Amino acid sequence: MRDATPFYEATGHEIEVFERAWRHGLPVLLKGPTGCGKTRFVQYMARRLELPLYSVACHDDLGAADLLGRHLIGADGTWWQDGPLTRAVREGGICYLDEVVEARQDTTVAIHPLADDRRELYLERTGETLQAPPSFMLVVSYNPGYQNLLKGLKPSTRQRFVALRFDYPAAQQEARILVGESGCAETLAQRLVQLGQALRRLEQHDLEEVASTRLLIFAARLIGDGMDPREACRVALAEPLSDDPATVAALMDIVDLHVA
């Protein structure tokens, strides 16, 4: 049974750019804040293009071997197991490296030959050199807000990609996303969007992160399930945004102005 196409509300020309990049064998870089729809966009495009998707959530301990594969030992001896990047190349699918700057530096070395005209993947441990088929696509993402001197994409890496900038949607679009993702009433969606915009204005004051579209969707789903709106906004918005009780209380004052 085919999986349903994920809901996605386009905010610009990102679908057209992605499709053109795929047709020409160009890798794509997605940059934008947490919870603004980067991962959902890749899921949507994989289904739209009818391609297998291999998603990897990058972290500090993720190295090239985790992407390429490794030899395993079992009762029947030693065998090679492909990693997600290798499987995507073999199958001609999409490999999505989410928050790629979090991974170790050797991962960058591994993807460079795939992100230029060579479109090759070298498996040093098996001696194979895989030529990516035309349908293969490499997609990476990162949050520019987390950039620092120790963790960031080098210019030599960024310039191998077509880049798409994502941000939180305009109010009307974000309301449609909330309705589409949660099934909530349009009036509730509009109030939650207004709340989200009010919370985002606090970014430069008390919060390290702002209220993402993802968190607004969580709140809409909980309210739609019958939870008290104020409590839903507390657990889905205020508490995830801060551990400081005074800050949470201040956020709840803003919630009371928009939802309760």
Swiss-Prot record:
SUPFAM superfamilies: P-loop containing nucleoside triphosphate hydrolases (SSF52540). Keywords: Activator, ATP-binding, Cytoplasm, DNA-binding, Nucleotide-binding, Transcription, Transcription regulation. Pfam families: AAA_5, CbbQ_C. It is found in: Cytoplasm. The keyword Nucleotide-binding applies. The keyword NADP does not apply. ATP binds at residues 32-39, 92-99. Residues 234-253 bind DNA. Belongs to the CbbQ/NirQ/NorQ/GpvN family. This is Denitrification regulatory protein NirQ. It comes from Pseudomonas aeruginosa (strain ATCC 15692 / DSM 22644 / CIP 104116 / JCM 14847 / LMG 12228 / 1C / PRS 101 / PAO1).
